[in-house]
């Protein structure tokens, strides 16, 4: 029997591992009626640039697909192009702009965009009240005290 005065004695029998695994059942953890299988062919979007399309500043039908309504070059994430394709498209757009095939900005759409944004801003923005508040009695009295103190100090 173990008492508080006696030291703890280790048992002389070695620790034996159980021969049974932790989980007694041999069935898998989750049993689905239909096992989940990944499709063999992954879903792929059709590339925006076909194999026959030439990326060139004269190919306006191709270039117009990669420009926003305001005339800006769309990002690679939006275009879903490879780095090489995006670089070639960007160069072609810049060449077309310089050679005046393309405008630098699409002013028609930009004017509509500005008109909409201005109407939204002016409609919701509160106007600042620019009138000067009248001086209160407390403010006047404090100002008079300061003026009196200045006059007294200048008299000395």
From Swiss-Prot:
One of its GO terms (biological process) is translation. Its main location: plastid. Residues 1-54 are annotated as: Disordered. It comes from the Eukaryota. One of its GO terms (molecular function) is structural constituent of ribosome. InterPro entries: Ribosomal_bS18 (IPR001648), Ribosomal_bS18_CS (IPR018275), Ribosomal_bS18_sf (IPR036870). It is found in: Plastid, Chloroplast. GO terms for cellular component: chloroplast; mitochondrial small ribosomal subunit. Residues 13-48 have a biased composition (Basic residues). Keywords: Chloroplast, Plastid, Ribonucleoprotein, Ribosomal protein, RNA-binding, rRNA-binding. Part of the 30S ribosomal subunit. Belongs to the bacterial ribosomal protein bS18 family. This is Small ribosomal subunit protein bS18c. It comes from Lolium perenne.
